[in-house]
From Swiss-Prot:
Organism of origin: Vibrio cholerae serotype O1 (strain ATCC 39315 / El Tor Inaba N16961)
Gene (name only): fliG
Key words, A-Z: Bacterial flagellum, Cell inner membrane, Cell membrane, Chemotaxis, Flagellar rotation, Membrane
One GO cellular component, as annotated: plasma membrane
One MF term in the entry's GO annotations: cytoskeletal motor activity
Primary residence: membrane
Family: Belongs to the FliG family.
Motif range (Part of the EHPQR-motif): 141-144
This protein's name: Flagellar motor switch protein FliG
Protein origin, superkingdom: Bacteria
Site (Part of the EHPQR-motif): R176
Subcellular location: Cell inner membrane; Bacterial flagellum basal body
InterPro entries in the cross-refs: Flg_Motor_Flig, Flg_Motor_Flig_C, FliG_a-hlx, FliG_M, FliG_N
Example GO BP: chemotaxis
C-alpha cells in the first residue's frame, strides 16, 4: 500500500502479497482494467451471487494503488503464460485462464455454461428474483416442482423462499429435497413450461443430479435459527434417521473450531471486524481462543478489549453476524481456499 513520506519525498510502495488479495477484488481489478464492453461480456456469464460479490468489490475499488493493480496484472499474466503452449486443448486453456482471472468457482461455472450449457434457463432466471417473488410463483405448484426449484437455487436463496411457506409445507419440502437424487427430463420440461420458456430439446436425455441430503443441510444452514429448530424437531418426529443424517451434514458457527489454523487465518482476512466482533459476542470460550490465537497479538488484545466494552446486543444480531461469517466460509470452501469439517466425514 502507498505510504506518505513525511519529508515530502517520493511516495514509497510496499510489496504486495498477491495471495492476501481476495478473489473478488482481483476479479474487480481485472474487470476495471478492461473496456466496458469486454467487462460486460464477462459479467453477463456470471451467476447472480457472483455478480453481486464482484460488483461490490468493483464499487469499493476507488483508491487502488498502482502497485496493487500492477501486482494483480502481473500475477494474471504469469498464470496465463503457463497455459499458452501451442497444442494445448482450448477447453483446458479457457478453464485455466478464467480460473486465474475469476477464481475457481466463478470460472468453472462460466466454462460449464460456455462448453456444456446449463440445464434450464427457466430455472436460471429465478436466481435473479427476490425470494418472496419466487415463492409467490411456485407456492401453488406441485410439491415436485417446488422441490426441483429449491434444490436448484443457491441454498441461501432457497432458505428465504422456504421461510415463506407454512411450517407443514416447509417441512414436507425439506424432506423431499433430502430424498431427491435426480430429476427426470419430463420434470424439467414441465418446469420450463411453467416458467414460460421455450427450450425444446435442451433439457437433454440425462437426469439432472440435484437435491439430496447435502442440499437439505445447506438450506437448513441458512434458515433463521427459530425456523430451523422447528423444522428439525418436526422432521425428527416423522423420520428421526433422516433428521440425524441432515444434522450431521450441517455446519454451524461452533464448527469453525474444527477448521485448521491456516484456514482460520484466511477466513479472518475476509471477515469485517465489526461482523467478527458481533459474532464472537455469542461464541463460546473455545472458539474465541481459536480465533484469537490466529490473530496478531495486538489485534487479539484489541478485539478482547472491544468485546469487554461492547454493550448488550440482540441475539438476532449475533446470529446474523455468525451466519454472514459462515456464508464467507462456505464460499471460500467452494473456492478450495479452506476446508470445513462438519459432524460427518463429508467436507463442504
Amino acid at each position: 500500500m502507498a505510504k506518505d513520506n513525511k519529508d515530502g519525498g517520493e511516495v514509497v510502495e510496499s510489496t504486495i502479497d498477491i495471495s492476501e488479495i481476495p478473489g473478488e477484488e482481483k476479479a474487480a481489478i481485472l474487470l476495471l482494467s478492461l473496456n466496458e464492453e469486454d467487462a460486460a461480456g464477462i459479467i453477463r456469464h456470471l451467476e447472480p451471487k457472483q455478480v453481486q460479490r464482484v460488483g461490490s468489490a468493483m464499487a469499493r475499488a476507488k483508491d487502488l494503488s498502482q502497485t496493487k493493480v500492477s501486482a494483480v496484472h502481473r500475477a494474471f499474466l504469469e498464470d496465463i503464460q503457463k497455459y499458452t503452449n501451442i497444442g494445448m486443448g482450448s477447453e483446458d486453456f479457457l478453464r485455466n485462464a478464467l480460473v486465474a482471472a475469476l477464481g475457481a468457482d466463478k470460472a468453472n461455472n462460466l466454462v460449464d455454461q460456455i462448453l456444456l450449457g446449463t440445464g434450464s434457463k427457466g430455472l436460471d432466471s429465478l436466481k435473479w428474483m427476490d425470494p418472496r417473488q419466487v415463492a409467490s410463483i411456485i407456492i401453488n405448484e406441485h410439491p415436485q416442482i417446488q422441490t426441483i426449484v429449491l434444490s436448484y437455487l443457491e441454498p441461501d436463496q432457497s432458505a428465504e423462499i422456504l421461510a415463506q411457506f407454512a411450517q407443514r409445507d416447509a417441512l414436507d419440502l425439506l424432506m423431499r429435497i433430502a430424498n431427491l437424487e435426480e430429476v427426470q427430463p419430463s420434470a424439467l420440461a414441465e418446469l420450463n413450461e411453467i416458467m414460460e420458456k421455450q427450450f425444446a430439446g435442451q433439457a437433454g436425455a440425462q437426469a439432472a443430479k440435484i437435491g439430496g441430503l447435502k442440499a437439505a443441510a445447506d438450506i437448513m444452514n441458512y434458515l433463521d435459527n427459530n425456523i430451523e429448530s422447528v423444522l428439525m424437531e418436526g422432521m425428527r418426529e416423522k423420520d428421526e434417521d433422516l433428521a440425524t443424517q441432515i444434522q450431521d451434514l450441517m455446519f454451524v458457527f461452533e464448527n469453525l473450531v474444527e477448521v485448521d489454523d491456516q484456514g482460520i487465518q484466511k477466513l479472518l482476512r475476509d471477515v469485517p471486524q465489526d461482523v467478527l466482533q458481533k459474532a464472537l459476542k455469542g461464541a463460546d470460550d473455545t472458539l474465541r481462543e481459536k480465533i484469537f490465537k490466529n490473530m496478531s497479538k495486538r489485534a487479539a488484545e484489541m478485539m478482547k478489549d472491544d468485546l469487554e466494552a461492547m454493550p448488550p446486543i440482540k441475539v438476532s444480531d449475533v446470529e446474523a453476524a455468525q451466519k454472514e461469517i459462515l456464508s464467507i466460509a462456505r464460499r471460500m470452501a467452494d473456492n478450495g481456499e479452506i476446508m470445513l469439517g462438519g459432524g460427518a466425514d463429508e467436507f463442504l
